[in-house]
Amino acid sequence: MKIAVIGSGISGLSAAYYLSKNHKVDLFEKDNHFGGHSHTLDLNLNNKKISVDIGFIVFNYKTYPNLINFFKDNSIEIEKSNMSFSVSVKDTNFEYCGKGISGMFSNKSNIFNLKFLNMFFDLIKFYKKNNNLTIYDNNLTLGDYLTKEKLSKEFTDYHIIPMVAAIWSMPPYEASQMPLSFFLKFFQNHGLFKLKNRPQWYTVKNRSRTYVNKILNKISGEHYKNYKINLIKRHKENIEIFYGEKNEFFIYDKVVIATHADEALSILEKPTDEEK
């Protein structure tokens, strides 16, 4: 079959890779680089070139078994990574690193800082309570829950909301609006509520473009970047995908949409109730 995969993040790349074993697969990406969140930049610091991933960061063996197997299938090297979190509040002496007691009290004045101690003890209470919590109100947002639990402003503003905002790359207001159920499941599954014995995290050796380029070379068809898909029309015998300012189109037997759900819905002609 002739198949189109729309979106070149990890979902699109892996789908295109496995389908390429038996089919002709073309890959479409709306941006000027392949990889989605996996985006490596080269920086020159003090006349030294360093490569930095600005999206793809880390994974572990427990939570990402399919990704681990995907990397093994393609002989992609990985290495241990340090996943850490720190906060420094501008124009104050309020700062800490989240890695252990020594990190929390790396600023020795924190021992005598009442606001910091409020945050610290709320952190311990919050993590212990929510590590195995399974019964909660599905209608609550994270912000609602923090208010309901009467947690300190310091814990809310200088710890949990900044951490959520950092993990999902969103502003603090949006972090507070996150559904409580999603937040709890993610933190529980990733061991982020554990005060000790957290999982070992890993990253791709030589940065994420290493795996992106390797997978691109194994895709059976063409790679199209800067191709924004406008519309997908489904017919009985085939599927048309329209792209670009001139609304030109390709014809395929099957199409895999590997984008965010809202993007997928916006390009589907006549989506079904189930798809909505």
Q: Which residue stretches match the model-derived regions?
A:
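Mobile amphipathic helical/loop "lid" adjacent to a hydrophobic cofactor/ligand pocket
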Residues: Y61-L180, L184-K185
